Structures are given as C-alpha cells and as structure tokens.
C-alpha cells in the first residue's frame, strides 16, 4: 500500500515540476484528463467499508451493531494504514421516512385503493363490517392522511424543517383530523377530555393504524418493527424467502432509497450488512442484489448479525452466496481483522482472499463448494477480546433527530423502550451466568463473557453522548454485571459535577447482589429501569430452566429496585417442555401477586421454543431428558434453529388467558381476580398461598433492616448520597439534618465532632468516590461517626458498596 501511495505522490510531484501550470490551465482538457487517470490509479487502491442496517428494526434508536463495526473498522483502517472511508447507513429509520411522508403515502394509496375497496367488499360479504368500514374510510380519507402525515411524524420525532408541537392542539381535538381504529380505541377509553399531552400517543397510534392499512391493502409483509419476518424463519425454504424480494415496500421504496445512498462510491467497496432478526433478512438480500448489480467485481458483500449466528449457522444453500460473498459469524472482529490484515499486505481485493482456505469465523462458497469456517484461532480470539474490552461504539453517522419516539402505550416501562433516542451499548459481551436451559448457551454471544474496560468505556460513551446530544443509555447486555453497573454509576456521578448526568437502563439478573444499598446507589447514579427474566415463577420452574436464582432472590431484587424508584420489567416463559398445568397456574398466580404488590411494572409471556443451540437440547443429545422427544426434521440447506418436539402445541391454548390477564395487570386492573378464571376451559386452582409474595417481602424487609443495623465493616467501602447535610441547634444540643428521597431527616451528634462529621460526609459523597481513599472505608467512618450515628445514616443516604 505504501509503495502505491508513494508512486502516486511521485506522479503528482513530477506533474507539478515538469508542466507549466499556466499552460495546463489554458488546456483544461489535458489537465483534467491527466488527473482523471491519476484518480483512477488512486481509486484502485482504496477500500471503502459501508455498514448497512436494512429495515426494519426498532425505530426510535439505531441497532448497535453498526456503531461497534464502525468503530472497529476505523480503528483497523488506522492501524493498517488502509485508504478509504468507513460509513454506517441506518436504512431502517430512512425507510420509515420514505414511507411516512406526503409523497410516500400518496404512492401507497394510489397503488392500493382498488385492492382495498375490493377487499372491503369481500370482508363485508363475510360479515366483517368493521374491517370493511375501516378500509373504505382509509381510502376516503387518503387525501387527509397525506395532508397530515408530515405533521404527525413531526410530533413523534424532531425535524429540521417542521415543528410538530404547534400541530398537537389541532391534531388531538379537530373533527377533521384523520382517525383509525387504534386511535379511536384509545380515545374511547379515556375517562377525561383529550389534551395535548395525548398527542404523542395518538400520533404513534396513527402510524400504527396506517401500518395496518399498508399490511392489509399494499404489502402483506409490512410491519412497523419487522419486515417479512415469517419469510426467514426455520420453517421456510430459501426459494420462498426469495419471493419476498418482489414485495411492494422493497421495490417501490427501499430499492430507490438504497441506490441513492450508495451510488457514488469509488474504488473497492466492502459492504457489511447486519441481519439481527429474521425480519431484516429479505431486505438484506435486496440490498446485496442491488449492490452486486451496481458494483460487480468492485464490491464484496458480507452478512453478519444475530440471525446469521443462530439460524444460518449450518447453512449450505449455495444460492445464498449469489447475494453475499461470505457470512461472518459471532462478533466478526476476528474474521474482518484477518481479511483486512491480508488485504493491507497484498492489496488485492477482499474477494480474492476467499481462495478456498479456511478463515476464522467465515463461511463462503467457491466453485460450488461451501468452505466451512475455521472455528478456533487463539491469536484472533485474543484480539477479539481486546476489541470487546476497548471498542467504543461510534454513532457519528446517525442523525438522532430523525428517530421517531413512539408512545403507543401508557405503561411507563413500555414507554421507555420506544420513547427516547437511546445509545444502545453493552458493558459486557456474553452472559456471566450462561447456564439457562432455554438459552443459546453454546453460541459465542452467550457463552463467551467479557467485560469492557470500565474507565475508558465510560469516557468514550460519554463523549458519544456529548457529540450527539443524546444522554440516554440502553444497556443491551444479556445481563449487566452488578459490579459494572455500580462502577458506571459512580463514574456517572463524578462526571455530573461539571457535566450533564447520563440516564441509563438495561437487562439484569434478579439476584441477591441487588440489595437496597446497590439499588439506591444505582438510582442516584442514573439507573431508571431494569428488565430481567423470571421465566417460571415457581421453585420447580426456576430449577427446570436452571435459572440459578430462587423466588426469594427475585422478590428481594424487585423490592430493592422499586424502593429506589426504578421501573421493573420481567420476561416470563410458558410451555417449557416439562412444565405441568399446575406449575403454569402457580407461576401465573405468583406473577399476579408481584403486580399486586407493586413489584413489577410490566412483563411479557414468551412461548418456549426448543432451539438447536440451547442447553436443554445439547443435554438431550448427551442422553439426558429422555421424556423430551424432538421431532426429526427434513434436512434443510437454509435456516435451521427451531426444533419441533412432541407436545409443543399443547401449551398454545394458554396464550390468550395469560396475555389478557397480563394486559390488565400492567394497567393496575383486576389484580384480585382469580387467575384460573381467565381461561375458557377448566384450569386447576393455584396451590401456592395467597400471601406467598407478601411473606417473601417481609423476609426481604427483615434482611434489609438487619443489614442497616450491622456494625461498619473495617475494609468495606461506603458512599454518601444524602445531599448536603446541615447542623441545627436543638434543645438537646446539635442535630444533623439532611434530605433523602424526599424526606427531611435528623440525627443527634456531639457538638465537638459535628464539623468533622459534616466534612467527612461531604468528602465521601458518591460524586467524589476514590477507591484508594481510606475516607470511604468503614474503619474511617466508624472513627468519626461512631457506631450509633453510622447506623442512623444507613439506608438513609449512607450506602455500602459491593
């Protein structure tokens, strides 16, 4: 590379020295022709990397893989002195704006109105008058929808050209504003007059209503979050998946968008297409096909991401490699590092490196033969771990003002998912538990746990927040390590002395480490919500799925979080292969009690799916779980992950009852209704006590209070989060006064030590934490505060660290 760059530099020098500039200026044709050839010569040694997120993923914030890959490639380009640009294109958000605008809706209504009216006639003849009415109303209101759509979008996301705030008053009240079924359902349930505060929810529901119309009358594969998801599951052949390439949304909207974004690239181009979910795979194929048609031999296309890692682990479908040149498994860093290292030495195209040799975590096809990946490479594995520890996701290519903040539910935990432009990131790759029976524990993204370098990570992610003006962090870890969360909160508090504080939330495990002390500190340090798996809320159920925690741990963690003002969401499983009906109803009853006690804000029921990479299936292969009976499936060359098993459909009948009850509980309704009454068939009564959760809460409170009454541990570290204490005179002497969680609290102190106490508490504020400073130790605190005052402050601003 260096030789070619020097050669180019020499050509330019010779041109400058041996030509008279004035003469060249007079003959522009020769001048331009010379530099045209110089540019051609230079371009053949450039390598551009374009990271593409095809639609559709969560709209309010970009999927994080692009941020990590962007940072990775920029680092490697610098290290290997590779010439070219690195660009990340979030085409999911861009497609949203292509569709939901005046021109987009006009095109959709024009192409779909005949089909919509015909469909309405058919539905009416079948007795579905409501659906027929809705379709006819969309067609009738099409001009109104087109007139309003830009204002509706402006309400849910920032816009450089249009402020949505002023339209909220008219939108929520006008009899002439467009309405759909979801909007009207929301309005009908209001027990008050509609106001401008409802505008964001109504605008979000308006988009959902339009999405319903698009799915019904224009493109059956369309959904606001996933596109053509059913076309890429383990149940579908590659031929059937390819049929989705002719879908209207892809041909009318996505193809023109893609070509606009990529049509002006020069030199060699590496396209890294992220496929996190089945619902992005069809658009990934469309992207690859258009790229190949446009750039031919000047491009190399790679697929990677969650869907590739799970569903296409064993793929042997050669037609797939007509779209992509190779599949990159797992993190991707090692495989790309190897390819770029070889590229920097040889300066041949990336594609020429796919010569039949095995490459770490890369699968490709050469001359009709699938070349399997090299599964182990110690040097590259170590390099990957270093990237995991040190990479800072790079969001510089993202315009967060274009991200819609959708708010289609009043539930606060549901709102946090969609209502905010979060920087999605992780503080640890993989899961530190990685033993759950249902989880893909044999895959890299679960089993290979590795934490980030906490100090440099916080500094880097804070820099990203400042650059983009987005101070919300969503940790997408499999489960955030408690120690990592504590350290992040302390770093956040230190930064907050001079700069805005980050607000953050993420996935955790409901374990005993999350004490009231830790929850208080995390809440004070910016944690606003957690999500975690309970799965099966019974002792037997937790043991069956090998969760590694019990109901006492779960209730304890939930109590601590809720007392600290942190939102809590839980994932639930039904239909586990050996779950009994009694165990299911007991789990449902425990969930009801958790909601009734105010320990959960939201939850979600998942139907158990047996997967190829799960612990329970691997154990079955080893001769365990003989009652589990996987159904032999025909060999497939395409997607392979979900495994059918005898009896799997028996649990489907429970879905409606579980979900209808949960929907009520999440909105504080019907919390005393017997759980068995939600089903249209006979169910056993729960066999757990009605006060099961209440008893566990009592146990938590006793342990919490006992911990607050313990003597200070000499080497343990403590921090103060009780604000600025003041001294007051009282009839008995001197009192320490401070505010904590909205309460004004008092404690008697010795007059001669009062100033020293104030100084110590200010010194050990969490914002000042220094792990090397002895002032934060129990020994130092005890010497200044004394045991009595120490205990008076515990749980009221004085937090013990883990």
Residue map of PLM features:
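Conserved SAM/AdoMet-binding glycine-rich loop
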Residues: 49-57, 298-302, 458-567, 576
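Radical SAM enzyme core and accessory elements
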Residues: 26, 35-36, 43, 47-54, ...
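Canonical Radical SAM [4Fe-4S] cluster-binding loop centered on the CxxxCxxC motif
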Residues: 417-455
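N-terminal [4Fe-4S]-dependent radical SAM core
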Residues: 369-424, 743-745, 796-802
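Structural recognition of alpha->loop->beta junctions
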Residues: 317-338, 521-529, 586-610
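Short, positively charged and aromatic/hydrophobic N-terminal segments
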Residues: 11, 16, 30-42
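Glycine-rich beta-alpha loop elements in corrinoid/cobalamin-binding modules
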Residues: 56-59, 64-65, 69-105, 116-119, ...
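Flexible glycine/acidic-rich beta-alpha junction loops that bind and position SAM and/or redox cofactors
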Residues: 88-99, 308-317, 540-545, 574-582, ...
